[in-house]
Amino acid sequence: MMKIITFFMFTSIIMSKPLYGDKQIYSMLKNHCEMINGFPNLLDIHIYSNKEGRVLQLDIEVDINNKNYVFMGMKAMSLIGQYSKIPFHKFILIEHYPEPKIPSGFESDSDCAINYFVNKKIPENRWIKDCLSNSILQRKIENWSKLNKNK
């Protein structure tokens, strides 16, 4: 009986995915974005909490409105964000255009994005319709984590 319990415990440890803290997630996401061909200029990564939960936010610099940038950014956050010790509630992508154009923001529920980009459990059209929203977003600096304040 003890051998069976030990076997299942050992198997579950091997099969579980590693979990990382905010600094590691930040570093992994930055490296991942830099390795993607055609990924826009990465301005910054923010990890913070709001009333709804934890948020992972990418700020990118773009010259044109290209929906592929939204997919690339959300996919990168999904692939890396799934490994956070404390799960994220939302993924936010802010596209910064040359002056005087106002930045545009996109947000997605993190579980929904992970189910689309990583687990392939939902189709693209459902993710776009049910999970992705396009709006101008404002960050509250007081919500930023210490990691982002000390840059």
Task: Cite the ranges covered by each PLM segment.
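Classical Sec-dependent N-terminal signal peptides that target proteins to the secretory pathway
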Residues: 1-18
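Sterically constrained small-residue positions within well-ordered secondary structures
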Residues: 7, 12, 49, 84-85
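Polar/charged, Gly/Pro-rich intrinsically disordered segments
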Residues: 26-61, 86-151
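Short, non-transmembrane amphipathic alpha-helical segments
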Residues: 67-88
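Cleaved targeting-peptide boundary
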Residues: 17-26
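A short interface-forming secondary-structure element
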Residues: 57-71
